[in-house]
UniProtKB/Swiss-Prot annotation:
Involved in peroxisome biogenesis. GO terms for cellular component: peroxisomal membrane. This is Peroxisome assembly protein 22. Gene3D superfamilies: Peroxisome assembly protein 22. The chain crosses the membrane at residues 7-29.
Amino acid sequence: MKSTKRNTFFGLAALGALGLGYSVYKSFITSDKPSSLINLGINQERKSYTRQKVAIIVSESILAIQLPIQEILKNTKDVVFVLAPTIAKDEFLRENEVDSGLSFKVIETGTAIGCFHVLKHIKATYNIFNLHDFLPSSTKTSSDNEQLTFDLEEYVNLHLNNFLQNVVELPSDSTSIQETVNQYIYN
């Protein structure tokens, strides 16, 4: 009876050692770091991406900061880009060299309100946009533009806050936009 318990113990220990050895072997094979760095225990500096659900409305100010769209889509699971109505999806995908397998994370809309409706349905943890890109410039004085300004601001303030977890409205200067977006994309 004792020899059976001992044999079972040694068998399980050998199986565990074999599993551990295989996992170490697999990590060496699949690692993109040079083996000399792994052996020394030195890690290359890599960006750590968010694990949160993030939705970003891509408007002119987001395009201006030139985010690495392909890299972000490839390395994150739950980041979605919603395109403003002024941005064509095909052109956006081509300019940012987005793989066709990742294009489902880029959503095209036809209207400004449509962008915000998409945010409601995505139900992301962080919803990032620059409302100033959707509002007419202050130099225009048309009553239609004033009505659009009022309606969009009212819509965002009254309706979106009821549906979205965290609304992150971007500042107007490009440096602050870059810092704010990076804060939510990278850990």
